[in-house]
Design a protein with these regions (language model features):
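C-terminal hydrophobic helical "lid"/dimerization subdomain
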Residues: 259-263, 302-349
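Single conserved hydrophobic/aromatic residue that forms the stacking wall/gate
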Residues: 1-7, 12
């Protein structure tokens, strides 16, 4: 499944965003290469942003030189082949793939910050997993236990990992009796709620515009459900005795949620930005007086993905998915664009 144009009005209007074509099979070119037969590829809103052209400055500042591109950065499957330097992996091993192929030697990699390391990001700047097979690196592979199937966990590799990292940051300072707000109970938010429930004893408040998403949030362990109808800031202040929440995790990042999210963050609290789409407008004097922290979140580390897989293996985190055939990628992308997916969509070759 490839995208040939980005930011094309015709492409976006017609909603025939990607093409289903035959391409050569990936091959081993490095000793550390691993070819994975895809068992599931998560459909992410970032894929829509790639099609819309939002990621073009980050993918390829010079133009469309990287196109056509195979999308897909949330991938899991089975080992198909390995390079001569790879040890501990064999054909047929079920695996999940960390999305960033970092080189392992730059300063970010040495510090364990895999997502900031030098390298490539399949699905964004090189061919990804909307395909039958994908070439990655031994560094990116995590073996799956028998309890987890590739198609069930593929979206964890980015969506789940991003949600886990943000929630993990919050749980480091959340104490029993404190409050954590989750804005958006969709594909990422419903994972974060479960991570928070598994890792801390704070009260979890979830905000969403959708009754269906709020119902899912309740199933995932939220203590309080708030409809986003314009009065959500007042509702949060009422629930927190007028103080606001110690942590706010914003999985939307647009349509006014940044302003509201900061307004419902307690003084000295932390506002975690995960979703994106608008600018954060805040007077600097307000940050000085309230000492609120604004914290960005990008994917997560290889080690954090192993931690998330442990939670999934123990049944503490469960991913709600909807499956589509690989050839129906346009339908999956359209359903995501129109808000018809509960949880995450997964493409099955």
């Amino acid at each position: 499944i490839i995208v040939s144009l980005v930011g094309s009005e015709m492409c976006i209007r017609d909603r025939s965003w990607v093409d289903y074509i035959d391409v050569p099979d990936p091959v081993i070119t490095k000793g550390s290469d691993v070819i994975v037969r895809i068992g599931g590829a998560g459909v992410c809103r970032t894929d829509l942003h790639v099609i819309e052209g939002i990621w073009r400055p980050h993918m390829d500042p010079s133009g469309n030189a990287l196109l056509p591109l195979i999308l897909g950065h949330e991938n899991a499957g089975w080992v198909e082949d390995v390079g001569p330097e790879v040890e501990g992996l064999k054909k047929g091993d079920p695996v999940i793939i960390h999305p960033k192929i970092s080189n392992g030697t730059c300063i970010a990699c040495r510090r364990g910050q895999d997502m900031h390391g030098e390298g490539t990001f399949p699905g964004l700047d090189s061919d990804g997993g909307y395909a039958e097979a994908l070439v990655t690196s031994e560094r990116n592979i995590i073996k799956l236990p028998k309890s987890l199937l590739p198609k069930e966990v593929a979206p964890y590799s980015d969506a789940g990992l991003t949600a886990y990292r943000a929630a993990k940051k919050a749980t480091r300072h959340l104490l029993p009796g404190e409050y954590c707000v989750v804005i958006g109970a969709g594909g990422l938010g419903h994972i974060a709620i479960q991570v928070l429930r598994a890792m801390c004893a704070a009260e979890i408040i979830v905000i969403d515009t959708s009754d269906a998403s709020l119902a899912l949030a309740g199933e995932c362990g939220a203590d309080h459900l708030v409809k986003a109808d314009g009065g959500e800031v007042d509702a949060i202040l009422a629930l927190t005795k007028g103080h606001g929440a110690e942590a706010v995790l914003d999985f939307v990042g647009e349509n006014g949620t940044t302003r509201k999210g900061l307004a419902m963050t307690r003084s000295a609290g932390s506002y975690y930005v995960v979703g994106y789409g608008e600018d954060i407008q805040v007077p600097t004097v307000d940050l000085v007086i309230t000492e609120k922290n604004i914290i960005g979140n990008l994917v997560g580390t290889w080690a954090e993905l192993t931690e998330l897989m442990e939670l999934a293996h123990r049944g503490l985190v469960d991913l709600t998915t909807k499956e589509y055939a690989l050839k129906d990628a346009n339908l999956a992308l359209r359903d995501l664009h129109e808000g018809k997916i509960r949880g995450r969509a997964v493409l099955i070759p």
